[in-house]
């Protein structure tokens, strides 16, 4: 029951933001390609600049499943880092442990990836890490604990069951799926990160 409620809530959020946050939500949006609520089918009025920027920020937050405080901290770090703030922001978020667990194909959704980390199934360079926000460094190895490898969710993942979520592994990851291992070979580039976002709108939202 809880899973069904969560799935419906995610589907509703996906429709509101105009982006599928999970494979189930994508199927739901195919059946109902309009916003949620009784006025979902009605022609939408022109959004204000603020509303457009707010929605884009919410879209990015939702794709990484993070809280506003986490997003704000990441933005402040991105702003202080040399380069384009919007690109820096997405590159920093992509180096989160839960994001890389998802990209590697160990999980089907960001929520599942976060759960695997919190439940201490994931190691970084041989050390258990239970913080989804942990920043993985270049060259570090993300892998599943040996005692967890035989669990059904990981057996399913090792067989490639989640390849439809992300058919092509990003170039910044070296993944050995059968061994449930993934190495971050270098810092991600914004152009390679598989998230839908006009990051400049996010920058403008926080700079207001």
Swiss-Prot record:
It holds the Pfam family S4. The keyword Nucleus does not apply. Part of the 30S ribosomal subunit. Contacts protein S5. The interaction surface between S4 and S5 is involved in control of translational fidelity. HAMAP family: Ribosomal_uS4_B. Residues 28-48 are annotated as: Disordered. One of the primary rRNA binding proteins, it binds directly to 16S rRNA where it nucleates assembly of the body of the 30S subunit. InterPro entries: Ribosomal_uS4, Ribosomal_uS4_bac-type, Ribosomal_uS4_CS, Ribosomal_uS4_N, S4_RNA-bd, S4_RNA-bd_sf. GO terms for cellular component: small ribosomal subunit. Residues 95-160 form the S4 RNA-binding domain. GO terms for biological process: ribosomal small subunit biogenesis; translation. One of its GO terms (molecular function) is rRNA binding. This is Small ribosomal subunit protein uS4. Coiled coil: none annotated. Keywords: Ribonucleoprotein, Ribosomal protein, RNA-binding, rRNA-binding. It comes from Arthrobacter sp. (strain FB24). It comes from the Bacteria. Belongs to the universal ribosomal protein uS4 family.
């Amino acid at each position: 029951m809880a899973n069904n409620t969560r799935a419906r809530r995610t589907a509703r959020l996906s429709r509101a933001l105009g982006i599928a946050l999970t494979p189930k939500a994508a199927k739901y949006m195919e059946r109902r390609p309009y916003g949620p609520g009784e006025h979902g089918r009605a022609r939408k009025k022109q959004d204000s600049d603020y509303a457009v920027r707010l929605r884009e920020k919410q879209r990015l937050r939702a794709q990484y499943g993070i809280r506003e405080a986490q997003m704000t901290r990441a933005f402040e770090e991105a702003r202080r880092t040399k380069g384009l703030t919007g690109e820096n922001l997405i590159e920093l978020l992509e180096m989160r442990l839960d994001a890389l667990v998802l990209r590697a194909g160990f999980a089907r959704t960001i929520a599942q990836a976060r759960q695997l980390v919190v439940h201490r199934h994931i190691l970084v360079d041989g050390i258990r890490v239970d913080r989804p926000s942990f920043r993985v460094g270049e060259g570090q190895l993300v892998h599943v604990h040996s005692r967890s490898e035989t669990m059904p969710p990981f057996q399913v993942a090792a067989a490639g069951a989640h390849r439809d979520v992300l058919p092509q592994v990003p170039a910044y990851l070296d993944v050995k799926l059968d061994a449930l291992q993934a190495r971050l070979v270098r810092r991600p580039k914004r152009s390679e990160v598989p998230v839908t976002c006009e990051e400049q709108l996010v920058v403008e939202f926080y700079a207001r």
